[in-house]
Amino acid sequence: LQPAFTFHGDVFRIKAGINIASSDDNFFFFPDAEVEYEVLGNNLAVFAGAGGGLQKNNFLYLSTYNPYINNRLDIRNSKITEYYGGLRGDVGILTYSGRVGYKKIENLALFLPVDELLNPLRKRFDLLYDTATVIRIQGSILAHPISELKLSLTASQNIFSLSQEARPWHLPSFELKGKVSYEAIKDQAFVYAGLFMQNGVFTKDEEGKELLLNALFDISVGAEYFIAKNFGLFLDINNLANNKRQRWYRYPTVGLNILGGISLRF
């Protein structure tokens, strides 16, 4: 339930509301407010706000994020409150946004490896919880130099401060994504390339010593061609740098790989 009131002026917008969440017959109230002011019309607007909510950490959500978690877990919901500010706008062929936020998270879920009982060589992950503050800095740029060409770049940096744990175990703090796509033949042939970078995450080895896993540097290219209006073929070549990395301790990711298939659109 998120009741809110929004007032629009000539160059400003004010939203005031509240986010009401419930869990185990308990109710939680979070702010849902934002103020935006157009400094230079659509070219530049500044904004500030407050928000929050209850992240319901059920087993499906957690196992989607980490497929190697244990089946028996102490599952708790995460309570999040955030205050933020930033700017956004459009300048010619460019759309941009930048934002800095401060979050307080109660029951932030962290992941540490443990030996599987029936197979000590295989790792599973237990959940740990901590109260954390996170400063998040993020920005994005989208450009259309010509109608057939689109370029995008997004980056984010999280600065964690934890109450109990030494590190944000298995949580990345930096991500960068870039994509270039070009429509070679209108509605028929497309080529694209992508870049994805992520810092190495902290974990603990079998002796309980702190360990920093390798970072990710992934470059990919691909193409798609529609033979008919609704039927086409695609080919993707991923991880051109053949980056060998463990996103989860003892579970290496796939190196250079090629994927092809059929595309359908309706």
Which role fits each region the language model picked out?
Residues 1-10:
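Outer-membrane beta-barrel transmembrane domain signature of Gram-negative proteins
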Residues 11-13, 19-30, 34-266:
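Exposed, low-structure sequence patches enriched in small/polar residues
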